[in-house]
């Protein structure tokens, strides 16, 4: 821990309180708990959690932390799945200050909505809502947006998404603070917007919304992953289409994983797809879906909007354990989900202190709540579930609808399986069911925590030319599992594989065996959730982290790297 004395820390905390106000500073462990604990796992100590109310306040808080030689952990929604948003244990050599950016939630629309300027606390949901009247969409829709995830959090972690044509979250235009080799805090404006010269001028102009059209330059730098469409169509390439550590997608704020303090990002938006149609495809032979994917990517003039895979087992788990999530979104809309997600987090944190309540009380209560309602899935989906093991939800738009329908009719004259053209309600519910699958495995583990050891959640990216995408585990691994749950973004070959592990199994040892199998298959991992504190960062990613943070003062330890100042290794 830090060598600073208690008196020094008291003076430091007083300085933070002076900068942001006493009501926006937490230092009592009971009050900071929900910011120190990860979404799925991971936690550690922190000296304080501070909530700046403007970009200029954020700059001043950062300066105070650097002067006091504190570790800085930038945190927005704390929805990361691999522990990258929180402290990891208590073996750091300096005190940790968590800077929560939730109050910094402004959003600036540029031009006619073709681009936006997102701030540290801007959520995907608020961005989606602001763009809808303009007929535009952000990089990602229903998914992370439902749990209040931040736009900049996605950029910093190369987050993926279900939309085939948009690739991972990426930009080359951002405003960020970096601690340089001399330990000095510097502000770098690569937004392509004229904001002034000094940090105070730059940040005040953003805080006061004084950006004019004439300030905005278009200098050829990219504000989304511009060539992803060409990469995903290259079905003969022996590398994945996208994954977190892809060196071609690491650029300043993009992929920095908290090694920079990002103040704003400039992003492209996308024209909302009109006349969408969902085709629900089922088969018992994985090679049928392989042929469909390869043909569509190589030959279709119109790429799908989305192509989501579900195995029958995750279909069943999601039907039972994702039912309340499905019903809440279906009946109340996505705009209520961040509120309920936040409420659940606060309730869990409060009930943890009360011995009377069993662990996962809210999960158990919500599970029983879901049982009160009748079956929620359309009859044709249930029929396809009974007939077929493998399901593909193919969403097309515009001219792609006719193109897909005519080809699928011809293809299934000879191929095993079938498809049906969804009604609007069926299509909406099919994709909502797929979304509910993402949290269903976590709910299963919570409800059955007395009976299962844990959930082992992997997200992997397969090589684009791989034809053996469906996993077959050796008996010695299979015997340690209760359930194997496979779902993912099929056109991108990005899969989420959740394993419910039997009671008494060494989950860490099992994970190492799993990762070894993935390495043998040429897969990359993680694909979307980033390394956090659960995966070792490849050498190229470690090099990127060192370049961004030479003193190792920002989110140290990420990717299983050193937690010590100046990247010193433990002797």
What are these regions (language model features)?
Residues 4-5, 39-41, 45-47, 70, ...:
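Conserved glycine-rich FAD pyrophosphate-binding loop
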Residues 30-32, 36-104, 118, 138-139:
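Glycine-rich N-terminal segment of FAD-binding domains in flavoprotein oxidoreductases
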Residues 51, 81-105, 161-184, 259:
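Structural signature of FAD isoalloxazine-binding scaffolds in flavoprotein oxidoreductases
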Residues 132-288:
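FAD-binding subdomain of flavoenzyme oxidoreductases
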Residues 25-29, 51-52, 72-76, 83, ...:
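General beta-strand structural signal in soluble alpha/beta enzymes
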Residues 274-306, 313, 320-368, 378-411:
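A conserved active-site cap/scaffold subdomain adjacent to cofactor or substrate pockets
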Residues 89-98, 103-104, 109-151:
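Anion-binding (especially nucleotide phosphate/pyrophosphate-binding) glycine-rich loop
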Residues 1-27:
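A charged N-terminal "starter" segment
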